[in-house]
Amino acid sequence: LQDFSLSVNAGECVVLHGENGIGKSTVIETAARLLPLESGSVSHHGKVVCDGEGRRNNPAKPFGLTLQANCLVSSQTVQQQLGNVVAICGKSFDCKGVIDSYNIGNRRNDKIAHLSGGQQRKVAVLSGLIPGMVDEESTLILLDEPDSGLDDAAVEQLVNHIHMLRNLGHAIVIATHDKRLLECATALHDLSKSTEQEPTNNEIWQVNTTDND
């Protein structure tokens, strides 16, 4: 991506859309510090977490992340996987209710490796959402095509959770083609047009780059 700037504030849901290969996943992965910058910077809560000079700093607080790849530990159970997310956030939270809400309550104690692809995707989505569910303070949540592989009921539940988290003041960035998720947006960003959004004093996340690998 070149000459790209984007910010998301507390209580906002920015949805990235556009044709395949336009850079939606690049934005998400750069925001998560998974891709290097040739120039520019990424900030969380006003603190630069990486830049084109190679500097890297830990974010001020944990953030939620669901990538296109599920990135789960196959030897862990569903409960262990989500419990680890809660522990990273330094919070206490009973995951039973949210596990049940995605109709995988009966698989709670099963290993990730034994789940179907759709069930694994539900766990990956919950892993990205839980940091917002456990924290009263505004949290950044990054979701890369979270609807991929989900059944209709799960997508409906995902939409409900996104609305809930946004109303609680969390900052959400979603890359998607799904029209149901587009309706969650407080701002749409078409990467094929790549219009710049000016940051405000309440910004939770900002990325500015003139080039990206």
Task: Provide a role label for each language-model segment.
Residues G40-G52, N57-P59:
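Conserved ABC transporter NBD signature motif
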Residues S92-R107:
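Conserved ABC ATPase "signature" region
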Residues K111-G118:
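Conserved ABC ATPase signature
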Residues E145-P146:
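Walker B catalytic motif
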